[in-house]
C-alpha cells in the first residue's frame, strides 16, 4: 500500500533477498498476502502494523494494480496485487514496534518515510521501479478510477 504521513511522505521498507544478498537492496511499499477471511483493506492495515509499526491509518481506495512474477528467498511468486492508498494521521517519525515474520526479519533492513523529492534526487532503487513518478499525481489528489495498472 501507499502509506502517506501528514507531510506527504511515503513509508518504505528497505529489503534484500536473503537467498541472493549479492543482488543488493531496494526500498519497497509495505504489503503482503490477504489471509483467509480478510478484505484487502484489512490485510493492508495488518501489514502496515506488522511491517511499518503504524497502528492507525485511514484506508483509501485501490489506486494501482499490477501483476508480478519474481523469485524471493528461494520461492517463486506469480501474483496479482492491489495497492491501496492509506493516510497516516501523524508525522512520519512516530513508528511503533514491528511484528515481523521470520523471513521478514532476515530480509528487512530498515524502514523510513521518504518524500518524492528524496526519491527522485537520490536514485533510490524502489519497487515498483517508477514509484517516485507514480506518487506525483497521488500527492495532488489525482487518483484514477478505475485504478491504474502499473
Q: What are the residue ranges of the model-derived segments?
A:
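N-terminal strand-loop-strand
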Residues: 1-28, 41, 56
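A structural microfeature
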Residues: 12, 61-64
Amino acid at each position: 500500500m501507499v502509506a502517506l504521513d501528514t507531510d506527504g511522505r511515503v513509508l518504505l521498507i528497505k529489503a534484500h533477498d536473503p537467498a541472493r544478498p549479492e543482488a543488493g537492496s531496494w526500498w519497497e511499499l509495505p504489503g503482503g498476502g490477504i489471509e483467509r477471511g480478510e478484505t484487502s483493506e484489512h490485510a493492508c492495515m495488518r501489514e502496515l502494523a506488522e511491517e511499518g509499526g503504524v497502528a492507525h491509518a485511514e484506508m483509501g481506495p485501490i489506486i494501482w494494480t499490477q501483476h508480478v512474477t519474481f523469485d524471493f528467498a528461494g520461492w517463486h511468486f506469480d501474483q496479482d496485487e492491489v495497492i491501496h492508498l492509506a493516510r497516516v494521521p501523524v508525522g512520519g517519525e512516530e513508528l511503533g514496534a514491528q511484528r515481523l515474520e521470520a523471513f521478514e526479519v532476515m530480509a528487512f533492513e530498515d524502514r523510513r518515510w521518504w518524500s518524492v523529492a528524496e526519491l527522485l534526487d537520490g536514485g533510490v532503487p524502489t519497487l515498483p521501479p517508477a514509484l517516485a513518478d507514480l506518487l506525483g499525481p497521488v500527492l495532488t489528489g489525482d487518483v484514477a478510477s478505475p485504478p491504474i495498472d502499473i
